[in-house]
Swiss-Prot record:
Documented EC number(s): 1.3.7.7
Enzyme class: oxidoreductase
GO biological process, alphabetically ordered: light-independent chlorophyll biosynthetic process; photosynthesis, dark reaction
Function: Component of the dark-operative protochlorophyllide reductase (DPOR) that uses Mg-ATP and reduced ferredoxin to reduce ring D of protochlorophyllide (Pchlide) to form chlorophyllide a (Chlide). This reaction is light-independent. The NB-protein (ChlN-ChlB) is the catalytic component of the complex.
Positions of [4Fe-4S] cluster binding: C29, C54, C114
Organism classification: Eukaryota, Viridiplantae, Chlorophyta, Nephroselmidophyceae, Nephroselmidales
GO molecular function: 4 iron, 4 sulfur cluster binding; ATP binding; metal ion binding; oxidoreductase activity, acting on iron-sulfur proteins as donors; oxidoreductase activity, acting on the CH-CH group of donors, iron-sulfur protein as acceptor
SUPFAM superfamilies: Helical backbone' metal receptor (SSF53807)
Pathway involvement of the protein, from the record: Porphyrin-containing compound metabolism; chlorophyll biosynthesis (light-independent)
Protein name in the entry: Light-independent protochlorophyllide reductase subunit N
Annotated InterPro entries: LIPOR_BchN/ChlN (IPR050293), Nase/OxRdtase_comp1 (IPR000510), Protochl_reductN (IPR005970)
GO cellular component: chloroplast
The entry's keywords: 4Fe-4S, ATP-binding, Chlorophyll biosynthesis, Chloroplast, Iron, Iron-sulfur, Metal-binding, Nucleotide-binding, Oxidoreductase, Photosynthesis, Plastid
Statement: the UniProt record of this protein carries the keyword Nucleotide-binding: yes
Length: 431
């Protein structure tokens, strides 16, 4: 169950209501998650099983040259595969044996695509047999374009990896040096952010027993009934459900550590659940904000419009409002209101403290109507997908690609300056 979980109805008498539109939605395909996940799991190899279109996307959109030899590849489905003329198992076995000989990974991750869904390819059935034959773990994740947003590809992969985590046993507690319960943090972030967030929690006497994903597959954290889990990204609701229902972890429902305010709230919530008093956290946040004054003076009083692309929009809106901006609308492809309840609560409190109205929250936004609303409010900054950036720039609105925020360091106290540096670039350009 969610520890101290706040439901939407409990947030406030005037709790934020989300509107839902049904417009055509434009985003990257979730198979793009391999671009950052293969860097996080250093001994992995990702095999995307799809069509030529998937291969073109990975090669062109992600900007990776063939000679760079990244640790992911395409298993291209041909006419014979789709018409069942070829044996899927034999073809995948041939590829996995070649990967084993050439790259020596500790784990192979099969990424299913739209085509494998449509032709009902039994990846989950083939993987156990093949991994027993070649002696390498094979994790199956269906990160296809049927999801709402491309970041949900990571959610699918982490949910699959959560099933492979070892079981937590009580005797493991004997090795812990602190009195805090075992805690697993889930979400893919750079190694520097892992170190920073782990250090911040250690300063509050909270010991992190593991991260999902881990840098090495063999180091996946142990999970079970006595283990608490907490996420760092708002698009990981499927992973949270897997950890709660399948692995019986206790989920800590918290805001996400994006921006100094979010990082402080994230740490405070974990400490509150563990019955610990925080020390020096408010002063730590104040120091960070004071160091950002040059950027804050640039954004203060400016307005923003988030069209919606990567499910980070609620957290980003809260951070921008805390920086002194006015956010007119938050478009978001999909929102798990239960998983983001604490973040919504923090957004409301931030708006109340800043004496600004709550932004309009629209799920599955219709881009045509969004552009009309944007024309009415004339925002200074639009955080948008790549498809709309140039037209909006031509109309005089500064834009920032939301996909850049996905690859940027957003989490923790130390990343606040980098985040503002990225967001303020279009404002400095037009200033």
């Amino acid at each position: 169950m969610l520890s101290d979980q706040v439901t939407t109805a409990e947030l406030h008498p005037s709790a934020p209501l989300t509107e839902c539109e049904t417009g055509i939605y434009h985003t990257f395909c979730p198979i793009s998650c391999v671009a950052w996940l293969y860097q996080r799991v250093e001994d992995s190899f990702f095999l995307v099983i799809g069509t030529k279109t998937c291969g073109y996307f990975l090669q062109n959109a992600l900007g990776v040259m063939i000679f760079a030899e990244p640790r992911y590849a395409m298993a291209e489905l041909e006419e014979g595969d789709i018409s069942a003329q070829f044996n899927d198992y034999h073809e995948l076995r041939r590829l996995c044996v070649q990967i084993q000989q050439d790259r020596h990974p500790s784990v192979i991750v099969w990424i299913g695509t739209c085509t494998t869904e449509i032709i009902k390819m039994d990846l989950e059935g083939m993987a156990p047999t093949l991994q027993a034959e070649i002696g390498i773990p094979i994790v199956v994740a269906r990160a296809n374009g049927l999801d709402y947003a491309f970041t949900q590809g990571e959610d699918t992969v982490l949910a699959a990896m959560a099933q492979r985590c070892p079981d937590w046993t009580p005797d493991r507690t004997a090795t812990q040096s602190t009195s805090s319960p075992p805690l697993v943090i889930f979400g893919s972030v750079p190694a520097t952010v892992v170190s920073q967030l782990t250090f911040e929690l250690q300063r509050q006497k909270v010991e992190v027993t593991g991260w999902l994903p881990s840098a090495r597959y063999a180091d996946l954290p142990a999970v079970g009934e006595d283990v608490y889990a907490c996420g760092v990204n708002p698009f990981l609701s499927r992973t949270a459900i897997t950890l709660m229902r399948r692995r019986r972890c206790k989920m800590i429902g918290s805001p996400f550590p994006i921006g100094p305010d979010g990082t402080r709230a994230w740490i405070e919530k974990i400490c509150h659940v563990f019955g610990l008093e925080t020390t020096g956290l408010a002063e730590r946040e104040r120091q960070v904000w004071s160091q950002l004054e040059d950027y804050l003076s640039l954004v203060r009083g400016k307005s923003a419009f988030l069209m919606g692309d990567n499910l980070l929009e609620i957290s980003l809106a809260r951070f921008l409002i805390r920086c002194g901006m006015i956010v007119h609308e938050v478009g978001i492809p999909y929102m798990d209101a239960r998983f983001q309840a604490a973040e919504l609560h923090l957004l409301m409190r931030t708006c109340e403290a800043a004496h600004v109205p709550m932004p309009r929250i629209v799920t599955k936004p219709d881009n045509f109507y969004q552009v009309q609303r944007m024309r009415d409010v004339q925002p200074d900054l639009a955080i948008t997908g790549m498809a709309h950036a140039n037209p909006l720039e031509a109309r005089g609105t500064g834009t920032k690609w939301s996909v850049e925020l996905t690859f940027w360091q957003l989490h923790g106290f130390a990343s606040a300056k980098d985040l503002l540096e990225l967001v303020t670039r279009p404002l400095r350009r037009t200033h």
